[in-house]
């Protein structure tokens, strides 16, 4: 499929298949089309009919309601992270002190950030939210106001929010940007917990350190196209990443994680 952002081809005849249950990392430099790929999944960008017809199929279906899509995919986009780490959605700016970590997770049922008086939280919703907080070991954040949390703590709650519908796959778009070492480590460990529990994880990033050991497959993007696609060990190499980023890069590995310099 081809997707334009203004006059620019952000995705250029992209052809890609990700199997159900597969843990994948999509890696590439800024401007390579990663965020456009996410926005296409969330229907914020639409593929062009020309130069060729396209098919966008998710979980075997090419027609989706928004509600069904949310249950199939939990997507944590850069835009959502930015909205949450500012403190609150503007829709709920009048309730800054009331929005807690638990509210943030519960708001996933209503596609909001935080809860408003017209949102009716059922006992089943409350139970699911508490179970997710406990499973991800962030129950200690449940009662704390969102606007008093660190960026890393808020991001972990936003990821928990994406899991309330028990999606088959979780898509994470640059979720580790600008975190300190401790917060980045906590986020990686939580992502590993999710992957090990059976939810497929798709990590979209330009940073090798975000690629958890559970990832088996890497897709390298450049100029809106798939430059390479294959096993992690074959593509997270100095040669492949030098070609992808157009910059001399050396790659090392330690305790299942890759790093570059």
Where do the PLM segments sit?
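ABC ATPase nucleotide-binding domains
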Residues: 242-261
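Conserved ABC ATPase signature
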Residues: 119, 145-149, 153
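Conserved ABC ATPase "signature" region
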Residues: 106, 110, 121-141
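H-loop/switch region of ABC-family ATPase nucleotide-binding domains
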Residues: 205-206
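Helix-to-loop junction immediately C-terminal to a conserved catalytic motif
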Residues: 42
């Amino acid at each position: 499929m081809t997707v334009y952002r203004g006059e620019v081809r952000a995705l250029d005849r992209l052809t890609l298949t990700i199997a159900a249950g597969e843990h994948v990392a999509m890696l590439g430099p800024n401007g390579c089309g990663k965020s456009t790929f996410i926005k296409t999944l969330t229907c914020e960008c639409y593929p062009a009919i020309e130069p060729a017809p396209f098919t966008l199929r998710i979980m075997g279906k090419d027609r989706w309601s928004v509600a069904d899509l949310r249950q199939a995919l939990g997507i944590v986009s850069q835009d959502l992270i930015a909205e949450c780490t500012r403190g609150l959605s503007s829709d709920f700016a009048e309730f800054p002190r009331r929005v807690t970590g638990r509210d943030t997770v519960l708001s996933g049922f209503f596609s909001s950030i935080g809860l408003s008086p017209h949102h009716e939280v059922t006992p089943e919703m409350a139970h699911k939210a508490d179970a997710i907080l406990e499973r991800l070991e962030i129950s200690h954040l449940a009662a704390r106001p969102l606007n008093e949390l660190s960026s890393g703590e808020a991001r972990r709650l936003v990821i928990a929010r994406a899991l309330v519908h028990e999606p088959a796959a979780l898509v994470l778009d640059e979720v580790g940007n600008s975190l300190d070492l401790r917060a980045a480590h906590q986020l990686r460990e939580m992502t590993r917990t999710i992957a090990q529990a059976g939810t497929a994880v798709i990590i979209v990033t330009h940073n090798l350190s975000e690629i958890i050991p559970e990832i088996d497959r890497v897709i390298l993007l450049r100029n809106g196209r798939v430059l390479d696609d294959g096993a992690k060990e074959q593509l997270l190499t100095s040669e492949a990443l030098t070609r992808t980023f157009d910059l001399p890069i050396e790659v090392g590995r330690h305790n299942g994680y890759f790093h570059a310099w």
